[in-house]
Regions:
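A short Gly-Trp-Pro
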Residues: 1-11, 16-141
């Protein structure tokens, strides 16, 4: 991996899909979403530009899912089922990358994660992206 804090190696659980993600703004874009799909998936995501994911292996092992408007495309390993990334609905020129797939990181490394209002998505309401809360991780003593 390149010695750049914004470039992160990643993979799915079984290792069939391996990639390198160049984060758009480091971890400043970290978030959770309240849309019906993300609520069930429970992932923490961070942004990468559309050309910011380079597959090292297994791109052909990815499968995808779309719902509702069909504008966001969610990618998964067809072997282990892990969500690796998605094309964002709010910005089609960006990917959301699953933080849990990034080497050496865990969603629990982030003590506070902004939660964005996906139930009232800006593309539906015409309004700005709205933060509806904060997901907090409090370490046990």
């Amino acid at each position: 991996m390149v010695d750049d804090a914004n470039i992160r190696a990643g993979q799915c659980h079984c290792g069939a899909v391996k990639f390198e993600a160049t984060l758009s703004d480091g971890f400043n874009t970290i978030r959770r979403c309240t849309c019906s799909y993300c609520r069930m998936r429970g992932a923490v995501a961070v942004s990468a530009a559309m050309g910011g994911i380079r597959f090292l292996q297994g791109e052909d092992a990815l499968t995808s899912y779309r719902f509702n408007t069909g504008s966001a495309q969610h990618f998964f390993c067809s072997h282990c089922g892990i969500y690796t990334h998605h094309q964002r609905r709010s910005n089609q020129n960006q990917y959301g990358v699953n933080v849990a797939c990034l080497e050496g990181l865990s969603p629990f490394d982030f003590l506070e994660v902004p939660v964005l209002d996906g139930m009232n998505h800006p593309n539906d309401t015409g309004g700005p992206t709205r933060r509806v809360g904060t997901l907090k991780f409090i370490r046990a003593d």
